[in-house]
């Protein structure tokens, strides 16, 4: 059983001579900095087996086949079960795992829930833990598990509320600037709306914004309207996520609990970024970046080994 996840780590400085340093999606919320992408494979106990440093503009899904191939080269071919989140689990990657006779347990895009809503409505919920329930569908040798968590629902609604308040507040400020004549160029107003959408993506997708202009190309006002139906549908899915696996003999409780073990990889990233000072990176050459990451992963592996020894020693 292999748990795989990716994260990013940013640079201080220009890193002009570093082939790995690129701008991309920043988990550190530092889009202003160049970064690298770090892949990590850990055991269910959180012990790191493999890591890889990719260029900072690498997409999670495109990196995954390289990870699988490298694991096979280093450790030989075996019947492995890969556990990855929905950012990695593209249709292409699932097909890749099937082609290479690898098993999988993956998160799926939330939009895929619509494909199963009618059938799921006829199924009963089964409690697997306090405030966690699941439903199961089996199709073509694969198992889909719909899980919903009260804790996750509260967290997602809090995030959405914060996004909606921020988006709405910034739109009101932009509309006020246009109304007072401080910002007249309609094209620049539309550009500002685009930047707000980038800043508040979880909220802006529910709104349509219009910027009427006069004959001279000046914006007359900024208006917006929310898609209440779309927002209500999203609220109904808060806390819900759909898992997919080819493990037909595993009960839904085992599938859910195994997927939750992905937190082991997330814990590793948190430890490396905080206690082990993975970020920010001050090195400017790619070789030194590779060495810096290696030392951080090695230190984390030693810490996990000591933790394991102490726990078993009582």
Task: Show where each model-derived region lies.
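Anion-binding and metal-coordination hotspots
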Residues: 1-314
């Amino acid at each position: 059983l292999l748990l795989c996840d990716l994260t990013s780590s940013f640079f201080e400085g220009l890193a002009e001579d570093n082939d790995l340093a690129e701008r991309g999606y920043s988990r550190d919320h530092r889009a202003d900095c160049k970064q690298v992408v770090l892949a990590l494979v850990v055991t269910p106990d959180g012990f790191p087996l493999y890591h890889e440093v990719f260029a900072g503009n690498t997409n999670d899904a495109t990196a995954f086949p390289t990870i699988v191939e490298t694991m096979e080269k280093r450790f030989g071919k075996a019947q492995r079960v890969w556990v990855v989140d929905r950012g990695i689990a593209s249709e292409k990657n699932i097909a890749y795992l099937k082609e290479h006779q690898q098993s999988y347990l993956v998160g799926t895009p939330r939009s895929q829930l619509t494909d199963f809503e009618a059938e799921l409505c006829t199924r009963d919920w089964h409690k697997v833990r306090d405030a966690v329930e699941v439903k199961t569908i089996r199709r073509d040798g694969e198992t889909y598990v719909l899980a919903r968590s009260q804790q996750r629902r509260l967290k997602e609604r809090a995030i959405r509320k914060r996004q909606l308040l921020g988006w709405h507040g910034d739109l009101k400020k932009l509309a006020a600037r246009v109304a007072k004549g401080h910002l007249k160029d309609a094209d620049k107003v539309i550009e500002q709306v685009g930047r707000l959408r980038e800043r508040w993506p979880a909220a802006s997708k529910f709104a349509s914004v219009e910027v009427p202009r006069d004959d001279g190309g000046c914006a007359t006002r900024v208006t917006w309207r929310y898609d209440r139906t779309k927002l209500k549908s999203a609220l109904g899915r808060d806390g819900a996520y759909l898992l997919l696996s080819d493990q037909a003999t595993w009960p839904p409780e085992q599938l859910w609990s195994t997927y939750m073990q992905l937190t082991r990889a997330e814990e590793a990233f948190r430890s490396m970024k905080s206690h082990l000072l993975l970020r920010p990176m001050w090195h400017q050459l790619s070789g030194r970046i590779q060495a810096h990451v290696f030392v951080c992963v090695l230190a984390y592996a030693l810490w996990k080994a000591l933790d394991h020894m102490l726990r078993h020693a009582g």
